[in-house]
Amino acid sequence: MPQLLLVRHGQAGATTANYNELSPLGHTQSARLGEWLAAHRREFTAVYVGGLRRQRETLAGIADAYARAGLALPSGEELPELDEFRFVELVRAFANAQPDHPDLLRWQAAPDDRGHWPTLLRSTLHAWAAGTVTEVGEDYAAFRARIARARERLQWQLEIGPVLAVSSAGVISHFLQDVLGLSTDATIDINLGYANTGLSEYRLTRAGLKLAQWNALPHLSAPQDRELVTLV
């Protein structure tokens, strides 16, 4: 039964200036994931990745591990539909729409404090989905349509064989929304709880895609690895 492995990128930089590149920990997470996949001889007939640097660097860490193990991994094909929503652009639009929102004010007081990011993202995504954040290049409906295109492309590729795709939490959570018919509120909650380099696995059946596992971290499951698990 053909399987799709969806992977979130590793931890990104700690500031808005370098969030599009992996942190040192993010590189470690990516390498560990690649080592686990290689050790379990996971083979893929196609590999896809979004165009964001943090996504491409994550795939590079996986590919390096395969190379060290002497295993073949198809070259990653860029699939723009796997790009994350533009967080900085969304926050800027949210600030224009709701300049006195408490989550925004807390973040503005300490913009590089990762602890403020989840609550700000939650409020921003709810406003975006509700249509009250409009000064953005991609509205929520367009984002949802893009995820649907990604799902169709990956499902088509699964007809040939197993697929690996590296993306981001927003894309992966909304992909799940499409498969399971989740509410927007539930999808946003899932988005915020998705771990860096977390794995989600789908199987292609006659009835379509079926979820097999969600947000798994088999490569970071040892007790001594707890400090390697991150959400932001």
Residue spans of the language-model regions?
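Short glycine/proline- and acidic residue-enriched helix-loop micro-motifs
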Residues: D103-A142
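Phosphate-coordination/substrate-recognition cap region in phosphate-metabolizing enzymes
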Residues: E35-T119
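Acidic, low-complexity terminal tails and accessory targeting/binding regions
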Residues: M1-P2, F85-D112, A141, W156-P162, ...
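A short beta-strand-loop-alpha-helix capping motif that often carries His-Thr
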Residues: L164-F175
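Loop-to-helix element that buttresses phosphate recognition and phosphoryl-transfer chemistry
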Residues: Q3-L5, G10-G61, D139-R144, A148
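Active-site metal-binding loops of divalent metal-dependent hydrolases
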Residues: G10, A169, N215-L217
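A mid-sequence, solvent-exposed acidic-amphipathic segment
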Residues: T134-V163
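Conserved beta-strand termini and adjacent loop/short-helix elements that scaffold enzyme active sites
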Residues: V7, L79-E81, W214
